[in-house]
Amino acid sequence: MANNFTTPLAASHGNNCDLYAHHSTARILMPLHYSLVFIIGLVGNLLALVVIVQNRKKINSTTLYSMNLVISDILFTTALPTRIVYYALGFDWRIGDALCRITALLFYINTYAGVNFMTCLSIDRFFAVVHPLRYNKIKRIEYAKGICVFVWILVFAQTLPLLLKPMSKQEADKTTCMEYPNFEGTASLPWILLGACLLGYVLPLAIILLCYSQICCKLFRTAKQNPLTEKSGVNKKALNTIILIIGVFVLCFTPYHVAIMQHMVKTLYAPGALGCGVRHSFQISLHFTVCLMNFNCCMDPFIYFFACKGYKRKVMKMLKRQVSVSISSAVRSAPEENSREMTESQMMIHSKASNGR
């Protein structure tokens, strides 16, 4: 792709700038990070999905959005083993461009499906708390089903074109996959990325902040009208949950999108200033902020655990049941083992006695 659409800026960069000079450090830290994300993300989200499916008869709009968020996280974790190997080899992709495109697809599906479903959750909570009479449970679940289908269609429409474009690039001694330098020669890339950041991050963040600020105002008004709600601690828990959700969203998604936007603005308005040092710094910032953004799939199960009382209770119940099963099986196997050892000893004694006679 970079060979077909080159700009004067790309041509002026030359081929002497090593944008992967940090690979010796990255090949250690990034595989460790993504291994952690893979284990925690897969186990945590599978556990959340099991709990949701077991209680599907009691499903509501909030649970439905959460389930779709969990599914997008699980899809993302399936792509991580290949990325772990890629980073461990020092940014060398050895399994073909087709798999590179698929991992890119799963990456962007997780990113923007996650953002969209978190936005849906904030809107859903807004109507449930601020305007409860406008949307009863039946209507909200029906609307939620349609919205989930629409979100998936929108995300796939945005990401499926990635399968049509080469995602890998042959460098001097390696093949890189899904790296920004592979596409920086595309003339329209800055505008595409700025548009994606505005629609995929700035707009959802504005909606989330607006919805949760209105919810907080409603909770404060309710506490003033009824002091018992403040004493019960319900409002405090709700506010802590809101702070947790906004904090995770801002911490995980903001650094990546800010890094992209500021670099694209530089590319458009000060192309001459983008020397090798600036480009390499941006490449390092991308790797760091992408790691931070991907850590979001580990945080989602913890949000469910602390925010949803029913989910927390179900998880603890499952863990207790598993522990009790393990203990009972261990206790049951111990007498069997002792009995087997005693039987073998008795047979040996009987055999020796027979030989003595």
UniProtKB/Swiss-Prot annotation:
Name the predominant localization. membrane
Alphabetically list the UniProt keywords: Adaptive immunity, Cell membrane, Disulfide bond, G-protein coupled receptor, Glycoprotein, Immunity, Membrane, Phosphoprotein, Receptor, Transducer, Transmembrane, Transmembrane helix
Q: Which residues lie on this side of the membrane: Cytoplasmic?
A: 54-68, 123-143, 212-240, 309-357
**Which segments show compositional bias classed as Polar residues?**
344-357
Write down the PROSITE patterns for this protein, in alphabetical order. Answer: G_PROTEIN_RECEP_F1_1, G_PROTEIN_RECEP_F1_2
- Region described as Disordered: spans on this chain: 336-357
Q: Topology in the membrane?
A: Multi-pass membrane protein
From the record, give the transmembrane residue ranges: 33-53, 69-89, 102-122, 144-164, 191-211, 241-261, 288-308
Q: Which family does it belong to?
A: Belongs to the G-protein coupled receptor 1 family.
**PANTHER family with a match to the protein in the record:** G-PROTEIN COUPLED RECEPTOR, G-PROTEIN COUPLED RECEPTOR 183
**How the protein assembles, per its UniProt entry?**
Homodimer and heterodimer. Heterodimerizes with CXCR5; leading to modulate the interaction between of CXCL13 and CXCR5.
What protein does this entry describe?
G-protein coupled receptor 183
User: From what organism does this protein derive?
Assistant: Rattus norvegicus (Rat)
Q: What is the lineage of its organism?
A: Eukaryota, Metazoa, Chordata, Craniata, Vertebrata
